[in-house]
């Protein structure tokens, strides 16, 4: 076993020195060893080199990494495998699988040195989806389901607020008004207070009016005015009278 470990280190040295083909051949041979503490990191490295050199496709590499993470558990090799797999899934547009694998790793091994990096990767992936627009290629209802399944990743503050409002606008654009209202109500009730809550509540009221639900629109308006000094916010101050008037007309 010690000899195999020495060879594994030598392969890493060859790669660091720029001799990737020789390193890959050594990793390939070591990946067939019977000892998991040798064959798993060897397969991890061999697959990475082959992918970098265009010898295998990203889906093929993802399949290898996915199988590898079940073979070797409990050390840095597993977490490195998971981080790479998460990146591959994201590049392939397999967002749910990416978030699933990253979240499960962080929950299972929170004290490992790389665990914090995985948590950061998970948060960044979620932000890329719902703040930077990577999820725009998904159907709105699919994006909503993905958001709800990982809603604990929604950041507090302005970024989280913007995520929810962007997603709600997408739902409104395809006439999914009930779903948009439910999303904004969750954000207003559970995650916001003060002026930010009032702004989201007015968006919620507008959607309820579009959906011909004036009572819910008025409830949203009244809940927002009870938690903040609306007069301090010009946007909210100018919208509320219009919303109340429209809600009264629909009633």
What are these regions, as identified by a protein language model?
Residues 1-251:
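Acidic, polar-rich low-complexity tracts and alpha-helical solenoid repeat scaffolds
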């Amino acid at each position: 076993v010690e000899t195999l470990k020495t060879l594994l280190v030598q392969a890493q040295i060859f790669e660091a020195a720029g001799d990737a083909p020789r390193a890959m051949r050594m990793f390939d041979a070591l990946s067939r060893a019977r000892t998991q503490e040798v064959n798993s990191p060897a397969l991890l490295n061999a697959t990475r080199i082959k992918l970098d050199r265009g010898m295998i496709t990203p889906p093929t590499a993802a399949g290898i990494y996915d199988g590898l993470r079940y073979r070797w558990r409990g050390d840095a090799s597993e977490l490195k495998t998971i981080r790479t797999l998460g990146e591959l899934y994201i590049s392939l547009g397999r967002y749910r699988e990416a978030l699933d694998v990253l979240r499960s790793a962080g929950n299972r091994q929170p004290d490992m040195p790389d665990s914090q990096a995985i948590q950061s990767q998970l948060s960044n992936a979620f932000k890329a989806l719902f703040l930077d627009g990577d999820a725009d290629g998904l159907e709105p209802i699919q994006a909503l389901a993905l958001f709800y399944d990982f809603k604990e990743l929604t950041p507090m503050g302005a970024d989280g607020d913007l995520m929810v409002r962007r997603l709600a606008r997408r739902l409104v654009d395809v006439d999914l008004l009930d779903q948009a209202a439910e999303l904004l109500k969750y954000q207003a009730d559970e995650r916001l207070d003060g002026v930010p809550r009032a702004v989201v509540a007015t968006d919620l009221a507008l959607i309820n009016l579009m959906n011909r639900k004036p009572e819910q629109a008025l409830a949203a308006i009244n809940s927002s005015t009870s938690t903040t000094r609306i007069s301090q916010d010009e946007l909210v101050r100018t919208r509320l009278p219009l919303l109340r008037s429209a809600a009264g007309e629909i009633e």
